Amino acid sequence: NQFDILLCSNLFGDIISDECAVITGSIGMLPSASFNEKNFGLYEPAGGSAPDIAGKNIANPIAQILSLSMLVRYGMKLKKIADKIDKSVASALKAGYRTADISNNNSYLKTNEMGDVISDFLINGK
């Protein structure tokens, strides 16, 4: 809760992202951004490609959605929209919606269902 941004080289970023995954409960919760000197950014989830779960509809979409929020906030300078995206993710989690990687029971959503829930919070402000 103390830090919003960690600045480090790629090697240490890989190590730190693995450590942060333990803190958050899943690598699927970690957005990331890489910038160059001209402020051009690459926004993507902190984890790898996870080929073992590709096409199974079980990946946690939150890191991707929060990476989009970072793109909107830092790349497009649209803070209010980024805040709405962040709030939608937080609202979905607060309401108890979870994907399998962060669920502590047998009730969880698939990737597309979690995306739909977060979209619903974003569009309808639920």
UniProtKB/Swiss-Prot annotation:
This is 3-isopropylmalate dehydrogenase. Pfam families: Iso_dh (PF00180). One of its GO terms (cellular component) is cytosol. It comes from Buchnera aphidicola subsp. Uroleucon rurale. The lineage of its organism: Bacteria, Pseudomonadati, Pseudomonadota, Gammaproteobacteria, Enterobacterales. Its cofactor is Mg(2+); Mn(2+). It comes from the Bacteria. Its EC number is 1.1.1.85. Its main location: cytoplasm. Catalyzes the oxidation of 3-carboxy-2-hydroxy-4-methylpentanoate (3-isopropylmalate) to 3-carboxy-4-methyl-2-oxopentanoate. The product decarboxylates to 4-methyl-2 oxopentanoate. Belongs to the isocitrate and isopropylmalate dehydrogenases family. LeuB type 1 subfamily. Mg(2+) binds at D14, D18. PROSITE patterns: IDH_IMDH. Binds 1 Mg(2+) or Mn(2+) ion per subunit. The keyword Transport does not apply.
